[in-house]
C-alpha cells in the first residue's frame, strides 16, 4: 500500500513528515510512504505580514487542496499552523507523540534584556510584552536556521521558537545565541 504525504519543503516540515511516515510504516505492514513536497503561499511570500495576509492558512491551504484533489492521502502540518476550523471534507486523523511544549527565548549573545524581539506571532508578542514591557516587536520569517542566523547577526535582540521544533531538528545550541526556555506561566504555547 502506497501512502502519499503532502508536506511543506522546510527542514522542520520534512523531519515531521518523515516521523509520520515512520509511524505509518510501523502501524501498517507493507506500507510505502512517499512525500509530496509543496511550496505554500506562506513559503513563497516571505515578505508578507502573516497576520495581515491570512495567517495560518497561508501554510496549509495548498496541502489541503492536494488532499481534496486526491493527489495526497495525508497532509502533515505543525498543529500550530492549523486553522480553527477544518476545511469541509477533511479531519485531523492523528498526532505525533507530544514533544516539549515550551517556547524558547533565543537571545543574541551578550543580550540580557532584549530591546527588539522578532516574532510574527500575535500570541507570542502579547505574552512577551508582559515579560519585556519596553521591548519593540518586529516581524521575522524564514526557517528555524534562518531565524537563528538573523538573531546571531543582530537583526533583532531576540526571537522565540518552539522547543519541539528545535528538538526535532536536533538543534540544542547555535553560535552567537543563547537558548532560554520559558516557563509555561511566562509563555503559553500554541494549541496542539
Language-model regions, residue ranges each:
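Domain-level signature for soluble enzymes in the chorismate/prephenate branch of the shikimate pathway
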Residues: 1-192
Amino acid at each position: 500500500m502506497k501512502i502519499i504525504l503532502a508536506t511543506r519543503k522546510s527542514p522542520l516540515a520534512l523531519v515531521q513528515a518523515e516521523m509520520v511516515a515512520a509511524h505509518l510504516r510501523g502501524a501498517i505492514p507493507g506500507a510505502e510512504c512517499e512525500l509530496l513536497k509543496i511550496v505554500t503561499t506562506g513559503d513563497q511570500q516571505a515578505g508578507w505580514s502573516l497576520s495581515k495576509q491570512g495567517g495560518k492558512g497561508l501554510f496549509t491551504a495548498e496541502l489541503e487542496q492536494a488532499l481534496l484533489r486526491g493527489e495526497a492521502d495525508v497532509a502533515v502540518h505543525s498543529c500550530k499552523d492549523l486553522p480553527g476550523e477544518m476545511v469541509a471534507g477533511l479531519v485531523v486523523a492523528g498526532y505525533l507523540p507530544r514533544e516539549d511544549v515550551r517556547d524558547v527565548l533565543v537571545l543574541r549573545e551578550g543580550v540580557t534584556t532584549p530591546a527588539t524581539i522578532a516574532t510574527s506571532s500575535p500570541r507570542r508578542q502579547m505574552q512577551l510584552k508582559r515579560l519585556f514591557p519596553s521591548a519593540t516587536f518586529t516581524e521575522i520569517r524564514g526557517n528555524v536556521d534562518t531565524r537563528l542566523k538573523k538573531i546571531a547577526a543582530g537583526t533583532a535582540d531576540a526571537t522565540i521558537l518552539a522547543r519541539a521544533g528545535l528538538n526535532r531538528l536536533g538543534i540544542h545550541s547555535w553560535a552567537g545565541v543563547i537558548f532560554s526556555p520559558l516557563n509555561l506561566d511566562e509563555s503559553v504555547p500554541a494549541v496542539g
